[in-house]
């Protein structure tokens, strides 16, 4: 009887699979011309961490010129502040609480550059535009539920689809908040010399792509808002779990598509590409970097079931955690090399929620938001180096 049931189940799966087709896409960009492909025809829409830094250096210098033009009275010797917000899914509640507490204390800088990856990419535009959006972030990261992010697909999606979940709900959420008004405000800040940079991973090219959101916003292109929304969705697209985002580009008159996913597949955070270091090192101005790591930086002990899926999940989480820690350490040493003042915030061992950790559990996120808020209000949040390194105490 059992054998008959198993056979029937396998036949049903086979018939279901027979009606499935792999999602289609346009050809990827040829390797030889990859860096010449331009989304929306914009030359400064994006940059590559591992590519020729000439264009990015030119963009940084133009931003400095715009800043001087916007504020002619500036002496040019003030401190330039960077903010980098990492990935971390629902742990983005930590950043949301920290930012609001920082605003209340009154010491939150007007950042010259804000960067974001994954959940940090969703937070970054609002952090970039200032404390007016603190309440919005509080609402998002204390009431969010999984059904507002994704819809689960059947198991056959593992073989015949592009992700185990459909992120149409996330696209709708992004569409609600990322509107023309928001884009116009970003363009206005770009005109003042400020930069908003979002990281995605191009799976075809296996490269981290840094999107210059201000330039896209200021382009006036009718499809700029659509591209902005797709970038935000792509930066949060966990490979395999969430569907990727296909971005249209053009090269030599031919149309191609690039497959973009979570920037965390390459780096869970970035402050600035290392190639820009000489600009900071040779400048008379002071540079200060603030990094918000939406996660812990120590091991998360837990018993692993002796099951294939459990072992694989635990191994992936371990690799992700290790990658995040390495990104923080890398940012620290790059900052030290360039003489940039380093400040790091992360979820510490003193965060012990009484509620269960789960996929977008509002009670857990509310507790984490309150933790970040209280840490900022107490001025007990910034560390001068990653844990375990000399001088890793709290900066006050």
Identify the function of each model-found stretch.
Residues 8, 21-112, 128-396:
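Patatin-like phospholipase
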Residues 8, 118-120:
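Alpha-helical hinge/cap motifs
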Residues 16-19:
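C-terminal motif of bacterial Sec signal peptides marking the signal peptidase cleavage site
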Residues 89, 117-118:
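Catalytic nucleophile serine of serine hydrolases
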Residues 3-7:
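N-terminal export leaders
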């Amino acid at each position: 009887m059992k054998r008959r049931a198993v056979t029937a189940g396998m036949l049903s799966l086979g018939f279901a699979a027979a009606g499935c087709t792999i999602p289609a896409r346009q050809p990827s960009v040829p390797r030889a011309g990859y860096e010449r492909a331009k989304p929306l025809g914009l030359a400064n829409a994006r940059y590559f961490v591992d590519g020729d830094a000439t264009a990015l250096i030119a963009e940084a210098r133009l931003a400095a010129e715009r800043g001087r033009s916007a504020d002619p009275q500036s002496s040019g010797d003030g401190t330039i502040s960077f903010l980098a917000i990492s990935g971390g899914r629902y742990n983005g509640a930590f950043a949301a609480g920290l930012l609001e507490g920082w605003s209340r204390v009154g010491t939150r800088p007007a950042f010259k550059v804000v960067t974001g990856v994954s959940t940090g990419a969703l937070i970054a535009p609002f952090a970039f535009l200032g404390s007016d959006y603190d309440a919005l972030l509080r609402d998002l990261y204390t009431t969010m539920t999984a059904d507002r992010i994704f819809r689960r697909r059947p198991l056959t999606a593992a073989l015949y689809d592009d992700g185990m979940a459909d992120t149409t709900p996330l696209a709708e959420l992004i569409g609600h908040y990322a509107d023309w008004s928001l884009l116009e405000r970003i363009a206005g800040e770009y005109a003042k010399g400020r930069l908003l940079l979002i990281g995605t991973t191009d799976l075809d090219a296996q490269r981290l792509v840094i999107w210059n959101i201000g330039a896209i916003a200021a382009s006036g292109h009718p499809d700029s808002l659509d591209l902005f929304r797709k970038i935000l969705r792509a930066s949060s697209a966990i490979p395999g779990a969430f569907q990727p985002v296909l971005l249209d580009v053009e090269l030599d008159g031919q149309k191609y598509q690039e497959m973009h996913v979570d920037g965390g597949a390459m780096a869970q955070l970035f402050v600035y590409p290392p190639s820009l270091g000489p600009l900071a090192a040779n400048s008379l101005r002071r540079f200060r970097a603030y990094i918000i790591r939406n996660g812990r930086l120590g091991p998360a002990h837990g018993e692993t079931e002796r099951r294939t899926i459990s072992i694989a999940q635990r191994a992936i989480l371990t690799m992700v955690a290790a990658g995040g820690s390495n990104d923080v350490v890398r940012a620290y040493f790059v900052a030290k090399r360039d003489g940039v003042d380093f400040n790091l915030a992360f979820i510490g061992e003193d965060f012990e929620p009484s509620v269960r950790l789960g996929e977008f559990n509002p009670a857990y996120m509310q507790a984490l938001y309150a933790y970040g808020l209280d840490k900022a209000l107490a001025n007990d949040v910034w560390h001068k180096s990653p844990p375990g390194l000399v001088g890793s105490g709290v900066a006050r």
